Regions:
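Phosphate/pyrophosphate- and phosphate-bearing ligand-binding catalytic cores of soluble enzymes
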Residues: 84-86, 90-186
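Short, low-complexity, polar/charged sequence segments that are solvent-exposed and flexible
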Residues: 9-11, 27-31, 45-49, 68-71, ...
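Gly/Ser/Thr-rich helix-start
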Residues: 1, 8, 32, 54-62, ...
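Generic secondary-structure boundary signal with a strong preference for alpha-helix termini
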Residues: 7, 43, 66-73, 80, ...
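N-terminal glycine-rich flavin-associated loop
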Residues: 1-4, 8-46, 73-92, 121
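A gly/ser-rich beta-alpha-beta helix-loop segment of oxidoreductase catalytic cores
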Residues: 41-79, 85, 150, 154
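Solvent-exposed alpha-helices and their adjacent loops that cap or buttress functional pockets
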Residues: 1-3, 18-21, 41-44, 56, ...
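Fold-independent oxyanion-binding glycine-rich loops
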Residues: 12-15, 24, 29-33, 53-55, ...
């Protein structure tokens, strides 16, 4: 917003980005970049997290909003999440307690802060995982202006529609106000 934000923004990034692989599980702190986690999974031949490799952002934010792309979502891989409640209590929530839906979760609704998460993946073929990640990166590049600073995907997809199609149909593709512009790519 041009008017700022009335509240506190907490960014867990440096110092909160540890990623550990144990068997088919990855435990990562909230500040770990999704690309970092995807690379760790690939190196250990773990499949199931390829969809997240090109999503900009950290694990904490991705868990809160159930981030997803190209048919995968965080709810598909989360085993448990450790959070800080509004009362200052540290709790570990199991996947079935998270009520994850399209770009929402019980964590979001409760206003909890994600501290870490355990992801459950499967053994796979390292070369196939690498190829899938490259395929998804190519698809992302063809639909998003990666060479420019971006706020990322802004609109939630209305049920039965794609935001990109609605933007194009409404004539807003390329629309610009000051230095902000709706992408030419969708």
């Amino acid at each position: 917003s041009d008017k700022g934000y009335q509240g506190v923004v907490i960014q867990l990034y440096k110092g909160f980005g540890e990623v550990k692989v144990q068997g088919c599980q990855i435990t990562a702190q909230a500040g770990a970049l999704l690309s970092q986690i995807a690379a760790a999974a690939r190196e250990e031949s773990l499949t199931g997290f390829e969809f997240a490799g090109g999503i900009p952002g950290t694990l904490g934010g991705a868990v809160v909003m159930n981030a997803g792309a190209y048919g995968g979502e965080m709810k598909d891989v989360i085993k448990e999440v450790t959070v800080l409640t509004r009362e200052g209590e540290i709790r570990t929530l199991q996947a079935e307690e998270l009520a994850m839906g399209y770009r929402t979760s019980a964590i979001k609704e409760a206003g909890y802060i994600v501290l870490s998460a355990v992801l459950s993946l499967e053994k796979g073929d390292k070369e196939q995982i690498k190829a899938r990640m490259q395929e998804l990166a190519g698809m992302r590049s063809s639909k998003q202006p990666l060479q420019y600073p971006s706020a990322g995907s802004t609109f939630k997809r209305p049920e039965g529609y794609f935001a990109g199609k609605l933007i194009m149909d409404s004539g807003l593709r390329g629309y610009q106000v000051g230095g902000a512009q709706v992408s030419e790519k969708h």
